Amino acid sequence: MRKIKKAIIPAAGLGTRFLPATKAMPKEMLPILDKPTIQYIVEEAARAGIEDIIIVTGKHKRAIEDHFDNQKELEMILQEKGKTDLLEKVKYSTELANIFYVRQKEQKGLGHAIYSARQFIGDEPFAVLLGDDIVESDNPAIKQLIEAYEETGKSVIGVQEVDEAQTHRYGIIDPLQKFGRKYEVNEFVEKPKQGTAPSNLAIMGRYVLTPDIFDYLATQGEGAGGEIQLTDAIERLNRADQVYAYDFEGDRYDVGEKLGFVKTTIEYALKDESMHDELVEFIKKLKLN
């Protein structure tokens, strides 16, 4: 069985929920404290043993490439001023993994974005990490899926429980037999209508896929929202060759919408010893209804 050493991070979306901030800045570069959200995703992949990452970009995404590239002039200035802590942080972001880029020329959905990276992946199994979900866990979420793949040799989809009222926002699994945190899946349903979801186990932005998925993406028609949905291709793969779901451990932060982004920023700030006490005092003084 081939080891998983490659990952895809889709980052071609327009980020319309964060306009006008994302008119000129990629959504993935919006910071949680002092790091852009996409760096948290790359760090998770690196901690899981991923060596090569391809980021699928679109127009106006050059800032992502610049962030993970060497900035020699900046490094020299920091070195001369003795700001070694900042220098190490700047250099760290360039040393996480081998990072490559491919452009999704048309906004045709997540499935199309993944298909855009097929030449980079070749015939290897690979990981997918979506940028809207930051996951905090001792064992990285994607590493948990890789370990499940190593047990089964099959594609593994990361899931977590959500409130039943929110199931229409996600891809949902119809689970069959359960093995610990791993499920056999009867069906994958993309964004079911309210009240029709087969469970409350939602697909949460982490995947380990065999290269067979590209055969299904190549012929996948439009699905929900008029886009080529990855979930639909996974469901077709599941009919031909068992796909598993894995209820991964970890705290998930939704940074793909404004309220979740604010909550994440506050929680991360409270974890930072340098600002915790002052932030707590500030929150206490707010006139909250």
From Swiss-Prot:
Catalyzes the formation of UDP-glucose from glucose-1-phosphate and UTP. This is an intermediate step in the biosynthesis of diglucosyl-diacylglycerol (Glc2-DAG), i.e. a glycolipid found in the membrane, which is also used as a membrane anchor for lipoteichoic acid (LTA). Belongs to the UDPGP type 2 family. Gene3D superfamilies: Spore Coat Polysaccharide Biosynthesis Protein SpsA, Chain A. Transmembrane segments: none annotated. Pathway: Glycolipid metabolism; diglucosyl-diacylglycerol biosynthesis. It holds the Pfam family NTP_transferase. This is UTP--glucose-1-phosphate uridylyltransferase 2. The keyword Transferase applies. NCBIfam families: galU. It comes from Staphylococcus saprophyticus subsp. saprophyticus (strain ATCC 15305 / DSM 20229 / NCIMB 8711 / NCTC 7292 / S-41). Its EC number is 2.7.7.9. Keywords: Carbohydrate metabolism, Nucleotidyltransferase, Transferase. SUPFAM superfamilies: Nucleotide-diphospho-sugar transferases. One of its GO terms (biological process) is enterobacterial common antigen biosynthetic process. PANTHER family: UTP--GLUCOSE-1-PHOSPHATE URIDYLYLTRANSFERASE. GO terms for molecular function: UTP:glucose-1-phosphate uridylyltransferase activity. It catalyses: alpha-D-glucose 1-phosphate + UTP + H(+) = UDP-alpha-D-glucose + diphosphate.
